[in-house]
Amino acid sequence: MGQLLEIWRHPIKSHGREALDSIEITAGKTLPGDRAYAVTHDNSDADGSTWVPCQNFSRGSKAPGLMAIDLAWDETQNIMTLSHPKLPDLIINPDDPADQKRFLEWETPLIPDNRAQSARLVRAVSQGMTDTDYPSITIGNMSSHRAVAQKLGQDISHLRWRCNFWLDGLGPWEEFEWVGRDIMIGDVTFEVRERCVRCLATTANPKTGVRDADTLGALETWGHREFTVYATPKTSGTLRLGDPVQLT
């Protein structure tokens, strides 16, 4: 039916991405280390203790430059290395107050002056700060991405969708038919919950942080702004690149 092509996590919400070869999945939980931290802005009082909507955070829909951040996380030492094409690399311990201050100073040039400014780097306590109020993992279909790129007439990067899992070997939009059903990736079962409604973040190039593609306009030609699906793991296990995908 298809296979697991790529695994990605985003340790700081909207601030970088990291590719993985394998990952341990726990039933009912978000992807380990995904959206484990988030950056609140000065109009929010969120502290990470409970899940709150994305409007509380600095994010790519308001600050497209954030989309070009890459991140590597050494969890053993709790050290993150962030890079951006317009900024020097930054190495921080995300739980260290002094490093949190350095991080906020580092990303300040990426936040437009007419937007709420970043205020705090907070750890998500109850669950990863995904865009759903339930623990979710985002699953994308490369065939659907190619359909959008073809509609645009542009060779756009799939990284602008900020998925956790990329699947290949499927038909375009096949993932939409999975909503309300279970799929297996390797030996792990997931409940596909709903489609993901997309925002302006996807219009920004993940290499440059510049808006350069009308992804939302392309989706609207199909009568919606939805791309990828949210799923919740029903069982635990290890996923690896190349694992098969099938409906159950």
Task: Name each model feature, range by range.
Residues M1-T248:
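Metal-cofactor-dependent catalytic cores
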